C-alpha cells in the first residue's frame, strides 16, 4: 500500500528539554521523521521547546514552533495550523502524554486531527500497567505476580500479599521516574508515594521481586499488513534491578540459547499484535530466570525509545525513519533499506559484530546523592562501541566514556586477599564502577563462582573478564613485546595506554612498536546484513582484522571530532555544532564524523559523508586519520565544535602532524592558561577579577589573602564548572583543597597534581555571555545574552535573555570592542565565547573559550543566524565578508537589536528529582558555580515577562496564577523581595513566611501568615510545619534563598520537599522578580504562538525597511 493520499499535513511533537531518561535520542528520531515526511510531500508542523536540537532548525519543518509542550499550547498550534494528523511516537513520554491529554480534552476530535503511528487504545494497553498485564496473559505469556494500587492504603495491602522485597513501577512515566525497590514498609511508603505522585494517572504496579534475573529487550516494528520484524535483541549485563538505561548493554543478546531467543521473539510478536501497534515500532523488556528459564514480560514502550536509537545505531536500521513512513501508510516491504539499497525494510538486520553500550553518570555533580543504581534511571549519557568480539567492543566502549577510572586498569600491585574480599563485597551493590571492581577482584584472585554469587552477572560475561586478565598476564610475561601477543591484546580491545601500563612503558613507545610491526586497525562497515549484500553507506568501526573496507575518494576529507557521550556541561549543544559543520562542508569536502554517542544526530549514517563510530581518544583519532589519508587527501580536522573532549586533543594531534583547522592549538592554550590570557587582557587594557594560581595549600591561602574573600576556586581545564566552588573563608578553602584537589609529593608537603585557579568573586554583578565569529580581521557578534541570575551561578544553569534588557548602548559597545580585542589577542579563527561581569560600572572579563559554546544553538534560533555553519566555513578559509556576500551571514551582526525584536529566554532544566540521598530525600536544589543542568528550553515572545513565563512552562510545567506562595529568604535578600511579594498580594496570592521574613514584610505593610520551620516541629495544637504543608500540596510556589554557607538544614528541607512535590522553587531574588512578571503575563491570557519561520519573515521585513534586526 503506497502512502495515504488523504494526509497533507502532520504535526510532530518533540520531547522537549534533555532530561535523564529522555535525551538526545529523540532529537535523532524526530529529525529523521521530519526529513522523511517532507520527502513524502507532506507539510510538517513541529513543536519542541528545546533550541539545542537539530529538529528545531527551520529547514527541517514547514512551521517550527519553539514553544512549551503543554496540552494548552499544542492545542493553540492545532487551532492555528489545522493539521490532518498528529504523530506522537517520536517525542518520548512527553509527546505521548501530551497526545493522550489532547485526546481526552476533545481537542483532536474538535479539529478533526487523526492520531497516527499509535492509537489511543494501543497506548493505554501498553502504558497502563493493569491493562498490559491482561495483554500478556492473553498472549499465553507471564508477568511477574503483581497488584495495581492507586492509594498508599492499597499499596500496603498489596505488600502483605507479595512480601518484600518488591518493585514499584508507576504508569505513564519514563526513565523509571518514581520507581524503586522496597525492602521494607518505610521504603515502600516513600517510593510508592513518589510513584503515585509522578504517575499522571496516580497508579503504581507492585510486583514480586525478580531481582537477579537476566534482562533482555526486543525492538520490533509492525505494519498495517501485519508484517512484523525484530530489529534487534539487546541484553543487559546487569541483572534485573538496574534500569536498562543505567546498565551496560550488549547487542545482539549473547547468552540466550536459540530456543530461548525464539520464545522471546514469539512472545514479543504476539504482544505487539495484541496491543495493536500497527504503524510503528515498540520496545519490549523481558526477564529470564537464570536457573529455571522462566520468562516474564516486564513492560512495553509503544513508541520510539532510547533503546530504539541504540538499536538503530547498532544495526544501521533506521527505526524512526521507517516508523514515520509506516505512520503515513507504507508497509515494511515497500520501504527500501538505505544502507544496501537492494533490500526492503522487511528483511531483519543480521549482525556479524558485537555492540556494547556503557552509560555515563554524573554523581560527582551531586555529592549527597546515593550512588546505588536502581530502577530509576540516573545516567546522563552513554557511549557505544562496535567490535568483532565482546571484549573488543566492551573495552572500546569503556574508554569512550571519557572519564577517569572508567576503564580496566593494571596499575601497581594486584589487590591482596583482604582487599579482594572487600572488592567482591562491594560488587554486590550495583554502582557506576562495579565492572571495574569486578576486574580488580579478578586481578586479586577472586573466583568466577564468588563473583557470580555477588553480582548475578551471567557467568559468560564474567568469563570474558577472566579472558582479559589472561591476555594482560601474557602481555606482562613476555620478555619483549612481540607482534603475536600485541595483536592478541589489540583484538581484545586493549588500548596502547593499557598495554603501556602493563609493560611499564610510555604510550608513544607502544605505538611505535605496534606501527613497526605494521599493526594497525582496519575499518569494517555496518551493513545490516552480515556482508550478504553490498553496503552503499560508509558507516565504519575499527577492528584488528584482515581487510579494511574504507573506499577511495576524490574529494579532500575534513574530519569533524564529535563530543562523545552526553554529560552535564557537554551535551547536545555541541553535537548541534558538529552536525552543522557536516552539513555546511558537504559538497566541496568529504565530511567525516568521528563520534561514539548513539543518541545523537551526528552519528546518523547520513549526516556526514562518512561515519566512524570510534572513541575520541588520541590513539583512535590518529588511526582514523591514517585510514582516511590512505584513501585520499585530508584537508583538515575540526576540534573546536565538540566541546572540551576534542579540544583537549588539539595540541597532541597538531604535534603528531595533523592539520588542525580554525583556532590553532597554541591559541586554545593561551585562552586556557590564566597567565598567558592575563597578558592578552593587560595588552588590550581589559580588567579581570583579581586572580592567582596555586600549586599547594600554602600558595592557595596566600593568593586568597591577597585578593580577598569571597573567592571562586576551581581546577584548570574543566568544562561545566567541574569542581568549582565559592569559598568565604580560610577554613572553607582548606576543606575545598582536601576534598577536591588530587595531590602528588610527600604527605607533609603535598603539591597539587594540576594548578588550582583562584578568582575574586564579584558579588551582585550582572553576568553577560557573548558568542561571536572572528576570521583574523573582522568580528561578527552573534548575540549578547544577559543572565537573569547574578554572577556566581554557572552560566549553564542560569536563565538568560537575548537581546539584553538592562544593558545600555554604551555598555554593549564596550562588550563588542572587548570581545574583538580578545579574539585578536588570542588568535581566534572561528567561534569565540566570552563571559563578562558588569559590577559598579566596570566590565570584567571572566573567561574566554575559543570554541563552540553551549549557547550557540540558542543564539542561532533566537537570531536566525547559523553561527556553527558559518564558523566551519571560516575554518575552511572563507572570511566574514565572503559569508555576507554568499548569504550565510546577514549584513548587520547581533550587536544591537531592533526595538521591536522579540525576546528569547533560555532556561536550564535541572535533574534534582532523579537524585536522592541515602536517607531517601531529594538532593539540594541550590544553584552555584558548578553546572548541574542536563538540558535547556527557550521561551520566545514579544517581551521578557511572556518569554520568561513560556520558559518556565516548558522547563517545569509553569508558574501558578493563584494560590499560596511561601517565602523564606536569607537576611541579605529580604529587602529585594518586598516589591515582588507586594505585587503577588495585589494579584490575590496568599503569602506564607517564616518569622524573620514575615517581620520584614510586616514592616513594609504586607500581611503574611507565619508558618513553622521544619526544625521547630509541629505546634502544641498540631500546627503543621512548612514542609508538611508543601508535602500536602497546600503551597503552590516556594521562594527560598540559601543562608550563606552556614547551617542550611531548614532551607534544605524546604527545597527538597518542594522538588519532591513538583512545585516551582525559586532560589534567587532575580529569578523571583522575573517569576512575578511571568505570572502577570500568564494572567493576561493564553500564550500567543508563532513559528520560527514567521519570526524570520518579520526579521527580513524589518531589514528590507532599512532597519536592522
Swiss-Prot record:
Amino acids binding Mg(2+) 1: 285, 299
Entry binding sites for ATP 2: 714, 760, 762, 767, 792-795, 835, 847
Cofactor note: Binds 4 Mg(2+) or Mn(2+) ions per subunit.
GO terms under biological process: 'de novo' UMP biosynthetic process; glutamine metabolic process; L-arginine biosynthetic process
Positions bound to Mn(2+) 3: 835, 847
Keyword Nucleotide-binding: yes
Region entry Carboxyphosphate synthetic domain, spans: 1-402
Region (Allosteric domain): 957-1109
Binding site for Mn(2+) 4: 847, 849
The ATP-grasp domain, residue ranges: 133-328, 678-876
Binding sites annotated in the UniProt record for Mg(2+) 2: 299, 301
Domain MGS-like: 957-1102
Enzyme Commission number(s) of this protein: 6.3.4.16, 6.3.5.5
GO molecular function, one term: carbamoyl-phosphate synthase (glutamine-hydrolyzing) activity
Matching HAMAP family: CPSase_L_chain_B
PANTHER family: CARBAMOYL-PHOSPHATE SYNTHASE [AMMONIA], MITOCHONDRIAL, CARBAMOYLTRANSFERASE FAMILY MEMBER
Quaternary structure annotation from Swiss-Prot or TrEMBL: Composed of two chains; the small (or glutamine) chain promotes the hydrolysis of glutamine to ammonia, which is used by the large (or ammonia) chain to synthesize carbamoyl phosphate. Tetramer of heterodimers (alpha,beta)4.
Protein's recorded name: Carbamoyl phosphate synthase large chain
Organism from which the protein derives: Beutenbergia cavernae (strain ATCC BAA-8 / DSM 12333 / CCUG 43141 / JCM 11478 / NBRC 16432 / NCIMB 13614 / HKI 0122)
Gene from which the chain derives: carB
Amino acid at each position: 500500500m503506497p502512502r495515504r493520499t488523504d494526509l497533507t499535513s502532520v504535526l510532530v511533537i518533540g520531547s522537549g528539554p534533555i532530561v535523564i531518561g529522555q535525551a538526545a535520542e529523540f532529537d535523532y528520531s524526530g529529525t529523521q521523521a521530519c526529513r522523511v515526511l517532507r520527502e513524502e510531500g507532506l507539510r510538517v508542523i513541529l513543536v519542541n521547546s528545546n533550541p539545542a536540537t537539530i529538529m528545531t532548525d527551520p529547514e527541517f519543518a514547514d512551521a517550527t514552533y519553539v514553544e512549551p509542550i503543554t496540552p494548552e499550547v499544542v492545542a493553540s498550534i492545532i487551532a492555528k495550523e489545522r493539521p490532518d494528523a498528529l504523530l506522537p511516537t517520536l517525542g518520548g513520554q512527553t509527546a505521548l502524554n501530551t497526545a493522550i491529554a489532547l485526546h481526552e480534552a476533545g481537542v483532536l476530535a474538535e479539529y478533526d486531527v487523526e492520531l497516527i503511528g499509535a492509537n489511543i487504545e494501543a497506548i493505554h494497553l501498553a502504558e497502563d500497567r493493569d491493562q498490559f498485564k491482561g495483554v500478556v496473559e492473553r498472549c499465553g505469556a507471564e508477568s511477574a505476580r503483581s497488584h495495581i494500587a492507586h492509594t498508599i492504603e492499597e499499596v500496603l495491602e498489596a505488600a502483605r500479599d507479595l512480601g518484600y522485597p518488591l518493585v514499584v513501577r508507576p504508569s505513564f512515566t519514563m526513565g523509571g521516574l518514581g520507581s524503586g525497590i522496597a525492602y521494607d514498609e518505610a521504603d515502600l511508603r516513600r517510593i510508592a508515594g513518589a510513584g503515585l505522585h509522578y504517575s499522571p494517572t496516580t497508579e503504581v504496579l507492585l510486583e514480586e521481586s525478580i531481582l537477579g534475573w537476566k534482562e533482555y529487550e526486543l525492538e520490533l516494528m509492525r505494519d498495517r499488513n501485519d508484517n512484523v520484524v525484530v530489529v534487534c535483541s539487546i541484553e543487559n549485563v546487569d541483572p534485573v534491578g538496574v534500569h536498562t538505561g543505567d546498565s551496560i548493554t550488549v547487542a545482539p543478546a549473547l547468552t540466550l540459547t536459540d530456543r530461548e531467543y525464539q520464545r522471546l521473539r514469539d512472545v514479543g510478536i504476539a504482544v505487539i499484535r495484541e496491543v495493536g501497534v500497527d504503524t510503528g515500532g515498540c520496545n519490549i523488556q523481558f526477564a529470564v530466570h537464570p536457573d529455571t528459564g522462566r520468562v516474564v514480560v516486564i513492560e512495553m514502550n509503544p513508541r520510539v525509545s532510547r533503546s530504539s536509537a541504540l538499536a538503530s545505531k547498532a544495526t544501521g536500521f533506521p527505526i524512526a525513519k521507517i516508523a514515520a513512513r509506516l505512520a503515513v501508510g507504507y508497509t515494511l516491504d515497500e520501504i527500501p533499506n538505505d544502507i544496501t539499497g537492494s533490500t526492503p525494510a522487511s528483511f531483519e538486520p543480521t549482525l556479524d559484530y558485537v555492540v556494547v553500550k556503557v552509560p555515563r553518570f554524573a554523581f560527582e555533580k551531586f555529592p549527597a546523592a546515593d550512588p546505588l543504581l536502581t530502577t530509576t534511571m540516573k545516567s546522563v549519557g552513554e557511549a557505544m562501541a562496535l567490535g568483532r568480539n565482546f571484549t573488543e567492543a566492551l573495552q572500546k566502549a569503556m574508554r569512550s566514556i571519557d572519564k577517569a577510572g572508567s576503564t580496566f586498569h593494571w596499575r601497581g600491585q594486584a589487590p591482596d586477599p583482604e582487599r579482594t574480599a572487600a572488592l567482591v563485597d562491594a560488587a554486590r551493590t550495583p554502582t557506576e564502577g562495579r565492572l571495574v571492581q569486578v576486574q580488580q577482584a579478578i586481578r586479586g584472585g577472586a573466583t568466577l563462582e564468588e563473583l557470580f554469587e555477588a553480582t548475578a552477572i551471567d557467568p559468560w560475561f564474567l568469563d570474558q573478564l577472566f579472558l582479559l586478565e589472561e591476555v594482560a598476564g601474557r602481555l606482562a610475561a613476555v620478555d619483549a613485546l612481540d607482534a603475536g601477543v600485541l595483536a592478541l591484546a589489540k583484538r581484545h580491545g586493549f588500548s596502547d595506554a593499557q598495554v603501556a601500563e602493563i609493560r611499564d612503558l610510555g604510550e608513544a613507545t607502544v605505538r611505535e612498536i605496534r606501527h613497526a610491526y605494521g599493526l594497525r586497525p582496519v575499518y569494517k562497515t555496518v551493513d545490516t546484513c552480515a556482508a550478504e549484500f553490498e553496503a552503499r553507506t560508509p558507516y565504519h568501526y575499527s577492528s584488528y582484522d584482515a581487510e579494511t573496507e574504507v573506499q577511495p575518494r576524490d574529494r579532500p576529507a575534513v574530519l569533524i571530532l564529535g563530543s562523545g557521550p552526553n554529560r552535564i556541561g557537554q551535551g547536545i549543544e555541541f553535537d548541534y555544532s558538529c552536525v552543522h559543520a557536516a552539513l555546511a562542508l558537504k559538497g566541496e569536502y568529504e565530511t567525516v564524523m568521528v563520534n561514539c554517542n548513539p543518541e545523537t544526530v551526528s552519528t546518523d549514517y547520513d549526516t556526514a559523508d562518512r561515519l566512524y563510530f570510534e572513541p575520541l581518544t588520541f590513539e583512535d583519532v590518529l588511526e582514523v586519520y591514517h585510514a582516511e589519508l590512505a584513501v585520499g587527501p585530508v584537508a583538515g580536522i575540526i576540534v573546536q565544535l565538540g566541546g572540551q573532549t576534542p579540544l583537549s586533543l588539539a595540541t597532541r594531534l597538531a604535534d603528531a602532524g595533523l592539520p588542525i583547522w580554525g583556532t590553532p592549538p597554541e591559541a586554545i592554550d593561551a585562552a586556557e592558561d590564566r597567565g598567558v590570557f592575563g597578558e592578552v587582557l593587560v595588552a588590550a587594557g581589559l580588567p579581570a577579577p583579581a586572580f592567582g594560581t596555586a600549586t599547594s595549600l600554602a600558595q592557595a591561602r596566600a593568593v586568597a589573602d591577597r585578593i580577598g574573600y569571597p573567592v571562586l576556586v576551581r581546577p584548570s581545564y574543566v568544562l561545566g564548572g567541574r569542581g568549582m566552588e565559592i569559598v568565604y573563608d580560610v577554613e572553607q578553602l582548606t576543606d575545598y583543597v582536601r576534598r577536591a584537589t588530587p595531590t602528588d609529593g610527600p604527605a607533609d608537603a603535598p603539591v597539587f597534581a594540576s594548578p588550582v585557579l583562584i578568582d575574586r568573586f564579584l558579588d551582585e554583578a550582572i553576568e553577560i555571555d557573548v558568542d561571536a565569529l572572528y576570521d583574523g580581521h573582522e568580528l561578527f557578534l552573534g548575540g549578547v545574552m544577559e543572565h537573569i541570575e547574578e554572577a556566581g551561578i554557572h552560566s549553564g544553569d542560569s536563565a538568560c535573555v537575548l537581546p539584553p534588557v538592562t544593558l545600555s548602548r554604551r555598555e554593549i559597545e564596550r562588550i563588542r570592542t572587548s570581545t574583538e580585542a580578545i579574539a585578536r589577542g588570542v588568535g581566534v579563527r572561528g567561534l569565540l565565547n566570552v563571559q563578562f561581569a558588569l559590577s559598579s560600572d566596570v566590565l570584567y572579563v571572566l573567561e574566554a573559550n575559543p570554541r563552540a559554546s553551549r549557547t550557540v544553538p540558542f543564539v542561532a534560533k533566537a537570531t536566525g543566524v547559523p553561527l556553527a555553519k558559518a564558523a566551519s566555513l571560516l575554518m575552511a578559509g572563507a572570511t566574514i565578508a565572503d559569508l555576507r556576500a554568499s548569504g550565510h551571514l546577514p549584513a548587520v551582526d547581533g550587536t544591537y537589536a531592533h526595538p521591536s525584536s522579540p525576546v528569547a529566554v533560555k532556561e536550564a532544566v535541572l535533574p534534582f528529582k532523579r537524585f536522592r540521598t541515602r536517607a531517601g530525600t531529594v538532593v539540594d536544589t541550590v544553584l552555584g558555580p558548578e553546572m548541574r543542568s542536563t538540558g535547556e528550553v527557550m521561551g520566545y515572545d514579544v517581551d521578557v515577562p511572556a518569554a520568561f513565563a513560556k520558559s518556565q512552562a516548558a522547563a517545569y510545567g509553569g508558574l501558578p496564577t493563584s494560590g499560596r506562595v511561601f517565602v523564606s529568604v536569607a537576611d541579605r535578600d529580604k529587602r529585594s523581595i518586598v516589591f515582588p511579594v507586594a505585587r503577588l498580594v495585589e494579584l490575590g496570592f496568599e503569602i506564607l513566611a517564616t518569622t524573620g521574613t514575615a517581620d520584614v514584610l510586616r514592616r513594609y505593610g504586607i500581611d503574611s501568615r507565619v508558618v513553622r520551620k521544619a526544625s521547630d516541629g509541629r505546634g502544641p495544637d498540631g500546627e503543621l510545619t512548612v514542609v508538611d504543608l508543601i508535602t500536602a500540596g497546600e503551597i503552590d510556589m516556594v521562594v527560598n534563598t540559601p543562608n550563606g554557607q552556614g547551617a542550611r538544614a531548614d532551607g534544605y528541607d524546604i527545597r527538597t520537599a518542594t522538588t519532591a512535590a513538583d512545585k516551582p522553587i525559586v532560589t534567587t531574588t532575580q529569578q523571583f522578580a522575573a517569576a512575578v512578571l511571568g505570572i502577570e503575563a500568564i494572567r493576561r491570557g493564553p500564550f500567543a504562538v508563532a513559528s520560527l519561520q514567521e519570526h524570520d519573515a518579520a526579521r527580513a521585513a524589518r531589514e528590507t525597511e532599512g532597519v536592522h534586526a
